[in-house]
From Swiss-Prot:
<dbReference type="GO" id="GO:1900451">
    <property type="term" value="P:positive regulation of glutamate receptor signaling pathway"/>
</dbReference>
<dbReference type="GO" id="GO:0060080">
    <property type="term" value="P:inhibitory postsynaptic potential"/>
</dbReference>
<feature type="region of interest" description="Disordered">
    <location>
        <begin position="151"/>
        <end position="172"/>
    </location>
</feature>
<keyword id="KW-0732">Signal</keyword>
<dbReference type="GO" id="GO:2000969">
    <property type="term" value="P:positive regulation of AMPA receptor activity"/>
</dbReference>
<comment type="subunit">
    <text>Homodimer, and heterodimer with NLGN1 and NLGN2. Interacts with neurexins NRXN1, NRXN2 and NRXN3. Interaction with neurexins is mediated by heparan sulfate glycan modification on neurexin. Interacts (via its C-terminus) with DLG4/PSD-95 (via PDZ domain 3).</text>
</comment>
<feature type="transmembrane region" description="Helical">
    <location>
        <begin position="687"/>
        <end position="707"/>
    </location>
</feature>
<dbReference type="InterPro" id="IPR051093">
    <property type="entry name" value="Neuroligin/BSAL"/>
</dbReference>
<dbReference type="GO" id="GO:0060024">
    <property type="term" value="P:rhythmic synaptic transmission"/>
</dbReference>
<feature type="compositionally biased region" description="Polar residues">
    <location>
        <begin position="654"/>
        <end position="666"/>
    </location>
</feature>
<dbReference type="GO" id="GO:0050839">
    <property type="term" value="F:cell adhesion molecule binding"/>
</dbReference>
<keyword id="KW-0812">Transmembrane</keyword>
<dbReference type="GO" id="GO:0035176">
    <property type="term" value="P:social behavior"/>
</dbReference>
<feature type="signal peptide">
    <location>
        <begin position="1"/>
        <end position="34"/>
    </location>
</feature>
<feature type="glycosylation site" description="N-linked (GlcNAc...) asparagine">
    <location>
        <position position="95"/>
    </location>
</feature>
<keyword id="KW-0770">Synapse</keyword>
<dbReference type="GO" id="GO:0009986">
    <property type="term" value="C:cell surface"/>
</dbReference>
């Protein structure tokens, strides 16, 4: 700020007026001479003009912003529902000083609050200002380039200042800067990179930060399950953006060999999926996965055809031929498509990434087990109270949860996620048992805490820990954190812990510049200090793959108190020790984050869920149709009179009985929902005893046959068989063993002989049902490398129409990693 000089003499009016004009003119000249010219940069597609923006903090240097840079051609008209193409070139200098339009979306209908960050759902009116003018021409990115080395570029002398002549150690990057590409979150239905300002992170961490838009919802993830509309356009947009970055970031001073992709929530799920796709190979080297995973129940849509049909019904395009259906959908306006309210099963998504055999070749857990992501350095973690939004609606005025509401919440969770009408009782009671604090079971506040922990563990912690285990199993660099801090604001209850999305403002340095419209927090010095710590960890990881170096934790320039993180060394994660960093005001390295609950969800629950099937397996392979959980949502009444919008799965026709006594009618007054008639297990017990006795009898017979055969062999040397018998001896010699094998395997073979090989019941070991539990109750594995054809009848024989060929020549459909796998050797 320029200050006017003071004069000791009192000039005459004329002289004073002339002096003021002269000083004003000189001030304008000085401002113009000191103001940096607008930065320009060349790219492979043309020149860009950005803007140099100062930041409201003395420790942050200015940042060059290039906003609205096209990374792909507009996906409009016939290009709707197709992979992106490179952007066209332009002549002259393109102005890149304004945010681009956002992709079409609708936040005015019911949004899935449980999947969205708190700062998003609490500020929907503010969010609406960012998406006022959506446009299908939305594939743009924003680039934030630091112009000076941030405060983290030097290791300060003992006084931590530069004004006394102490010599500071220069630890800045001597060459090109690391690049951090942020994938915004949401629920695959909403969001934009324009909401996140990367300036502070870029300036403080001395890295280039990029945010981007990608197609969301119907336009980004609609799939017909075949070549007509294969889906995953939103993921392909992200891949195209990474391709643009790797080819052009050097013009901005960035290092294409040090690109880190990071995201939170659904953005983290996208990052996790990108590490598993061979299309991403070579486009980035590191990934930061914040509060999300490809293993979460909502990361992948296992029923794309179902929701596409629902959409086609609503807009009058439901025809049998999928090519005609997609052509019809292309004729509809984007507004008409995104305004259709199609609600998925709870804990799942209607439009999201699909297993197409190419972009996502197989189930994410299978790909992780095959090592498809081992070539990437990965840092991941969760927040302490991610499940806040699942519980907030059932908390009473005294900040507690009643026993009835607790029971209802668990039952609703089991009904919606597991869905089958039989075999749920044991599972439901076991979950309630595991999440009851038996030392304080009647305390409503304790019930609230354990209920939040239930949803946090199932939807975030277990998928993240399993992802970390699979990645670190072969020594790939892995770092795990648990975030335990949040800012003070009115966006959520006072009793809440660090909820979903609460780490985002600290990652982007919001506390350093003060509250914003999306983060209206009362930031303290502790918040500023913790934000500096987080940005140092994140940018260190982007620079070296190690969050501990090259820049040490040093924040005395912010806070007079000692930074406890200076004494903490963030250890690598491994499946045995499972070390993780507790990020909070009292940091420490701990081990085995919520290990008991993770083991419960990973190992015990899948078997409890299928106990009924194991003991009641019929002799036919015909499966009872699962319940449909995607009918229009309705308001369910709870015993205390509160309402909870949900979608209870309908009972399967094989089990439903409309006139059965005790059947629930939505028009009746709500009574105790969880009171059930005592169940008589005598029949099941009798059948079990009978089967056990039969197996015992068969084993006795088998043992007798074996003993008889052994005794017969002992006496054989004393006998000389006749030539006729001698010729048949080999057959007789093997018959008892074959009979024994038949007796031992008889029950299994008999139970499954009518079914195909893949449906054979194996009683020797419990099958792994964890993949099933991520799918909605009525999911059927639709697309895997071994089963998918992705070619409708009307398209058989057509040649490849696009460079993103889902089934190129030599497509590997085996269970082994692809020939182009990113598996680390």
């Amino acid at each position: 700020m320029w200050l006017q000089p003071s004069l000791s003499l009192s000039p005459t009016p004329t002289v004073g007026r002339s002096l003021c004009l002269t000083l004003g003119f000189l001030s304008l000249v000085l401002r113009a001479s000191t103001q940096a010219p607008a930065p320009t940069v060349n790219t492979h597609f043309g020149k860009l003009r950005g803007a140099r923006v100062p930041l409201p903090s003395e420790i942050l240097g200015p940042v060059d912003q290039y906003l609205g840079v096209p990374y792909a051609a507009p996906p409009i008209g016939e290009k709707r529902f197709l992979p992106p193409e490179p952007p066209p070139s332009w002549s002259g200098i393109r102005n890149a000083t304004h945010f681009p339009p956002v992709c079409p979306q609708n936040i005015h209908t019911a949004v899935p609050e449980v999947m969205l960050p708190v700062w998003f759902t609490a500020n929907l009116d503010i969010v609406a200002t960012y998406i006022q003018e959506p446009n299908e021409d939305c594939l743009y990115l924003n680039v934030y380039v630091p112009t000076e080395d941030g405060s983290g570029a030097k290791k300060q002398g003992e006084d931590l200042a530069d004004n006394d002549g102490d010599e500071d150690e220069d630890i800045r990057d001597s060459g090109a800067k690391p690049v951090m590409v942020y994938i915004h979150g949401g629920s695959y239905m909403e969001g934009t990179g324009n909401m996140i300002d990367g300036s502070v992170l870029a300036s403080y961490g001395n890295v280039i930060v990029i945010t981007l838009n990608y197609r969301v919802g119907v336009l980004g993830f609609l799939s017909t399950g075949d070549q007509a509309a294969k889906g995953n356009y939103g993921l392909l947009d992200q891949i195209q953006a990474l391709r643009w970055v790797s080819e052009n970031i050097a013009f901005f001073g960035g290092d294409p060999r040090r690109i880190t992709v990071f995201g939170s929530g659904i953005g983290a799920s996208c990052v996790s999926l990108l590490t598993l796709s061979h299309h991403s190979e070579g486009l980035f080297q590191r990934a930061i996965i914040q509060s999300g995973s490809a293993l979460s129940s909502w990361a992948v849509n296992y029923q794309p055809v179902k929701y596409t049909s629902l959409l086609a019904d609503k807009v009058g395009c439901n025809v049998l031929d999928t090519v005609d259906m997609v052509d019809c959908l292309r004729q509809k306006s984007a507004k008409e498509l995104v305004e259709q309210d199609i609600q998925p099963a709870r804990y799942h998504v209607a439009f999201g990434p699909v297993i197409d055999g190419d972009v996502i070749p197989d189930d994410p857990e299978i790909l992780m087990e095959q090592g498809e992501f081992l070539n990437y350095d990965i840092m991941l973690g969760v927040n302490q109270g991610e499940g806040l939004k699942f519980v907030e609606g059932v908390v009473d005025p005294e900040d507690g949860v009643s026993g009835t509401d607790f029971d209802y919440s668990v039952s609703n969770f089991v009904d919606n996620l597991y869905g089958y009408p039989e075999g749920k009782d044991t599972l439901r009671e076991t979950i309630k048992f595991m999440y009851t604090d038996w030392a304080d079971r009647d305390n409503p506040e304790t019930r609230r805490k354990t209920l939040v922990a239930l949803f946090t563990d199932h939807q975030w912690v277990e998928p993240s820990v399993v992802t970390a285990d699979l990645h670190a199993r072969y020594g790939s660099p892995t770092y795990f954190y648990a975030f335990y801090h949040h800012c003070q604001s009115l966006m959520k209850p006072a009793w809440s812990d660090a909820a979903h999305g609460d780490e985002v403002p600290y990652v982007f340095g919001v506390p350093m510049v003060g509250p914003t419209d999306l983060f209206p927090c009362n930031f303290s010095k502790n918040d500023v200090m913790l934000s500096a710590v987080v940005m140092t960890y994140w940018t260190n990881f982007a620079k070296t793959g190690d969050p501990n170096k090259p820049v040490p934790q040093d924040t005395k320039f912010i806070h007079t108190k000692a930074n406890r993180f200076e004494e903490v060394a963030w250890s690598k994660y491994n499946p045995r020790d499972q070390l993780y960093l507790h990020i909070g005001l009292k940091p420490r390295v701990r081990d085995h984050y919520r290990a008991t609950k993770v083991a419960f969800w990973k190992h015990l629950v899948p078997h409890l869920y299928n106990l009924h099937d194991m003991f009641h397996y019929t002799s036919t392979t015909t499966k009872v149709p699962p319940p449909d959980t995607t009918h229009s949502s309705h308001i369910t009444r709870r015993p205390n009179g509160k309402t909870w919008s949900t979608k209870r799965p309908a009972i399967s026709p094989a089990y439903s009985n409309e006139n059965a006594p005790g059947s629930w009618n939505g028009d009746q007054d709500a009574g105790p929902l969880l009171v059930e008639n005592p169940r008589d297990y005598s029949t099941e017990l009798s059948v079990t005893i009978a089967v056990g006795a039969s197996l015992l009898f068969l084993n006795v017979l088998a043992f007798a046959a074996l003993y008889y055969r052994k005794d017969k062999r002992r006496q054989e040397p004393l006998r000389q068989p006749s030539p006729q018998r001698g010729t048949g001896a080999p057959e007789l010699g093997t018959a008892p063993e074959e009979e024994l094998a038949a007796l031992q395997l008889g029950p299994t073979h008999h139970e499954c002989e009518a079914g195909p090989p893949h449906d054979t019941l194996r009683l020797t070991a419990l099958p792994d049902y964890t993949l099933t539990l991520r799918r909605s109750p009525d999911d059927i594995p639709l697309m895997t490398p071994n089963t998918i054809t992705m070619i409708p009848n009307s398209l058989v024989g057509l040649q490849t129409l696009h460079p993103y060929n889902t089934f190129a020549a030599g497509f590997n459909s085996t269970g082994l990693p692809h020939s182009h796998s990113t598996t680390r050797v």
